[in-house]
Amino acid sequence: MDLSAAAALCLWLLSACRPRDGLEAAAVLRAAGAGPAWSPGGGGGGRTLARAPGPSALQAAAVPGPRAVRRAAGSGFRNGSVVPHHFMMSLYRSLAGRAPVAAASGHGRVDTITGFTDQATQDETAAAEPGQSFLFDVSSLSEADEVVNAELRVLRRRSPEPDRDSATLLPRLLLSTCPDEAGTAHLLHSRAAEPLGGARWEAFDVTDAVQSHRRWPRASRKFCLVLRAVTASESSPLALRRLGFGWPGGGDGGGTAAEERALLVISSRTQRKESLFREIRAQARALRAAAEPPPDPGPGAGSRKANLGGRRRRRTALAGTRGAQGSGGGGGGGGGGGGGGGGGGGGAGRGHGRRGRSRCSRKSLHVDFKELGWDDWIIAPLDYEAYHCEGVCDFPLRSHLEPTNHAIIQTLLNSMAPDAAPASCCVPARLSPISILYIDAANNVVYKQYEDMVVEACGCR
């Protein structure tokens, strides 16, 4: 094999690591799993790392920035009815840019935080009066994932009807599971309802309840809780509205009401290395299901065509990804020449081409999710800097390239007899994770950390 063929082979093998345009950047994402790096200017210059959330991290979530609010309020997502909860937006901003650490409670590192919005209707809540019921569809949680922490967050406003006895005896809040088939409800929390000077979110730890629900072999897909208020002596019930609780937004069903609904925040740890491509496939399945034509293709042909149009857009993006990954080798000769006439230069200019190309180093690679057609389900970031490795690995190899012994021997043989062995390849030697906030196939907002997303250093292998 001559030097030109060897270089072309290396470039083909590494095409997923060194794409040339926005669509080819999907090869990098497919090989790893993405996470966000949000910057106020939208430049995507840096990576984002996630910290496993402890109680302090959840409480420290900041108010979402203007760009996040505009994106949340828009209709650019795959499902226009999904309004990202402010808490999840704030959580992303709070955790972005921090290195992953162990969870504060000693449970270990978590890599996924999912926000499940309350799905209880006003009628179901009225049936629980004087309490309030909450219903969450947790079926999208993978059985292979370990639930590390679960927290129920309920909005409590300043009470319009202050309890006159609150100065002496504080009423109590009782949180329990919904009655099971035998009519048994399990009390989870009992605590005093402190007086409020303004609105705030009441947080309840429901980790044990969620874990028990998942262990039950015939568990419902819905996780149900009931919040009640009683007098200090727990002898008689109180209306939750007197303490500032109640149906969000007056039951108008608007965007404000959706953002004020109760939220079940579950932190989990995956047992296997996650790939972003798994989520992409789930998104594609959800898109196909949403775009299925009606049984009667009569007058509805127009709407079917519109649905297929959206479906075609996603297919085009994914097809472009596959095409870029596959054609990267075909363009590898010419693409490799971008560094100085390498792969496509042919055998005649072999020596000159090698001298003209730069040594193995890290190069810029900007990933724009809009170009990939993923901006309808990815909330943040809209873009990020992934970097890629490019250049020649010639003898003698520099120590900062951290070559393996095999790469050293192979490079030495190649320098002595190019036809005996190809040159070693410039590849990522060290990668770091980033995080991504997105809407999953079940329309839940998920904060997830993906490994091996940003090239930190390049080496010869």
From Swiss-Prot:
Signal sequence extent:
1-19
User: In terms of domain of life, where is this protein from?
Assistant: Eukaryota
Composition bias of kind Gly residues appears in 323-350
Q: By its UniProt entry, which InterPro entries does this protein fall under?
A: Cystine-knot_cytokine, TGF-b_C, TGF-b_propeptide, TGF-beta-rel, TGFb_CS
Identify the keywords attached in UniProt to this record, alphabetized.
Cleavage on pair of basic residues, Cytokine, Disulfide bond, Glycoprotein, Growth factor, Secreted, Signal
Q: Which GO terms describe its molecular function?
A: cytokine activity; growth factor activity; identical protein binding
What subcellular locations does the record give? Answer: Secreted
Q: Where is this region: Disordered?
A: 287-360
For this protein, the record's SMART domains field holds:
TGFB (SM00204)
Q: Disulfide bonds, which pairs?
A: C360-C426, C389-C458, C393-C460
Family, according to the entry, reads as follows: Belongs to the TGF-beta family.
Subunit-level organization: Homodimer; disulfide-linked.
UniProt biased composition (Basic residues): 351-360
Per the record, its GO cellular-component terms are:
extracellular region; extracellular space
Q: Which Gene3D superfamilies match?
A: 2.60.120.970, Cystine-knot cytokines
Q: What's the name of the protein?
A: Growth/differentiation factor 7
- What does the entry give for GO biological process? activin receptor signaling pathway; axon guidance; BMP signaling pathway; branching morphogenesis of an epithelial tube; cell fate commitment; epithelial cell differentiation; forebrain morphogenesis; gland morphogenesis
